[in-house]
Structures are given as C-alpha cells and as structure tokens.
C-alpha cells in the first residue's frame, strides 16, 4: 500500500476527538493497510488514525516479540526455538470496558512526539471491545506492553498525547533508546 506522513505534536488534529466509523468501507481497509506500512516503517508498535491526519476511530497494534536473533547456528540436538506469539490487531471503534486498579509507571514514546520519552502511569491491565475489518466484535484483555499500547492508542482517538499525562518528559540522547508505543 502506501506510507502516510505521521503528524507531530503541535498539529491541532492530534488534540481532537476522532469520529466513530459507521461503516467499514474499502477506504477504511486501505487506511488500515497504509497504517500498518507506516507503523512498521517507523519501527512503532501502534498507530492511531489521527496520527496520519485522519480523525476516525481506527488503531493498529503489533506487540509481537521479535525472534531472538543472536546470529548463532542452533546445535543439532538443540530444542527448536518456538515461534513468537503473534499479537497483532486492527481495532475499529475501540472502547475501554475495564481497567485494573493496579497501575504501573513505564517509559513511553510516540511516533508523533519524536525524540522524547516520558514516564506515564497507566492501569496494569485493560479490557477493550472493538470491531475488526470484517465487522466482527471482539474483546481484548491486555497486560504489560499490550495494555500500554491499547491505552496509548485509544488516548490518541480521544485527542490525548502521552505528553499530556506524563509525570516527566526527557529528550532522547541515543536514538536507539526509543521505547515501544
């Protein structure tokens, strides 16, 4: 498909609430494909439609653990390396339906806030109801990186950046230091 430009903090679109998707059309499917391409090109784990300038309630998330590639050849009698669990979602009209009382503080970054990270306190676990691109409703129960990504991307749909809720924000000195999200 196509790469889309990721808009950055300061663009007023990022502070607006996104509109519900009433019908899943080919345009919405193309937008989702473009969002995957854009997110992967930027090494992100999630992307919300407002980040590419579209005020619709659409999110893509991929928190699949990359395979451990240390470059060593496996020994002949070694156990086979298990395939990573694929944790990848397209969420149409996602809605938070439950959060844990327990919270966790972690570093977050954002493709729309390049060069910075912040400490954000979020619920440790979350339940989200959404629809897929075929119109099927489903519920995700996420914790850890998945919970953080779900909450972060749904914030985008509501016009909230992590910088709006971060306890502290710092500039990244080393570009390899960018955390997931």
Label each PLM-derived region with a short phrase:
Residues 1-151, 156-181:
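Active-site rim/adjacent substrate-binding subdomains
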């Amino acid at each position: 498909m196509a790469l889309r430009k990721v808009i950055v903090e300061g663009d007023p679109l990022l502070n607006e609430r996104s509109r519900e998707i009433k019908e899943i059309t080919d345009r919405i499917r193309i937008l989702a494909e473009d969002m995957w391409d854009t997110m992967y090109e930027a090494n992100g784990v999630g992307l919300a439609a407002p980040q590419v300038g579209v005020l619709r309630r659409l999110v893509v998330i991929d928190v699949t653990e990359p395979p451990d590639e240390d470059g060593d050849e496996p020994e002949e009698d070694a156990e086979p390396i298990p395939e990573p669990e694929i944790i990848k979602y397209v969420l149409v009209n996602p809605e938070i339906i439950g959060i844990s009382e327990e919270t966790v503080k972690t570093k977050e970054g954002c493709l729309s806030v390049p060069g910075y990270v912040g400490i954000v306190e979020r619920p440790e676990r979350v339940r989200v109801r959404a629809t897929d691109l075929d119109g099927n409703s489903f519920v995700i129960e996420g914790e850890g990186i998945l919970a953080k990504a779900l909450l972060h991307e749904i914030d985008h749909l509501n016009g909230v950046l992590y910088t709006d809720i971060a306890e502290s924000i710092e500039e990244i000195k080393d570009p390899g230091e960018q955390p997931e999200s």
